[in-house]
Amino acid sequence: QRFLGAIGYAHGFFNLEFFYDDHDDCLRVIECNPRLASQFSDLYERVHGVDAHAMALTLALGADPQSLPRVRPTARAAASLVYRAFDANGDVPPAPAVPQREALARRFPDALLFSFAKMGRGRARDFRWTGSHRYGIVHLGGRDREDLRQRCEDASELLGWPAPYLDHGSLPARVHASAPSLSSLGEPSVEASAG
C-alpha cells in the first residue's frame, strides 16, 4: 500500500514483481505493472468469484466493476505454483507424460497445468537471461492454506516435480516472486509463488 500510494496508484489491477532477500528479510520491488497479470486471472475467480478480464475491461470503459455478476467461489485459497530449475548444469524434471496428465486431471479436476519443456539453446537462453528455467506452472485451489499446501505437494509428487516452495537446495538466496492484487477490492487469498 505504501508503494502504490507513493506512485499515485488509486485503483485497478496491478502486477507487482519483487525480490525477497533472506539475508536481511527485505522485499525489493523490481517493477510494478499497472495491468492484470493474466497468469493469475483464474485465481480471482476461484477465490472471489470474479472474472478478472471482465473487470479490467469494465474499468477501462470507466464503469464500476462491482456491478459485474460474480460466480460462486470454488476455493478459499488458491496458488500459482511456478516450477523452476536454477542449476544450468543440473537435471530438469521431464514434462509430465500423458498418463501423469490424466492422473492429475482425475485427482485434481480444478488443476491447470502448463508445461514449458525446453532443450538446448532455448533452455540456455532462459538461464542466461533469468538465471533459471521455468519448466512448469500448476494452478490449484484449496479449502484453506493447509489444504492448498497439501494439494500442491500431492500434485507436485504426482507430476514428479519438487514443490517449488520447499527447500530442495536448488533455490538461490534471492527468489523472484509475483502476486496478484486488486487494490480497489482488497487483497485476494492468493498465494505468491516462488517464480
Functional labels for PLM-detected ranges:
Residues E17-D21:
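Conserved protein-kinase catalytic-loop segment immediately C-terminal to the catalytic Asp
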Residues Q1-L16, N33-P94:
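Active-site "cap" helix and flanking loop/linker of ATP-utilizing ligase/carboxylase catalytic domains
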Residues H23, A37-Q39, R143:
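Short coil/turn motifs at secondary-structure junctions
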Residues D25-R35:
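A short beta-strand motif that forms the metal-chelation/ATP-contact edge
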Residues L57-G195:
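Peripheral (often C-terminal) accessory segments that flank ATP-dependent C-N-forming ligase machineries
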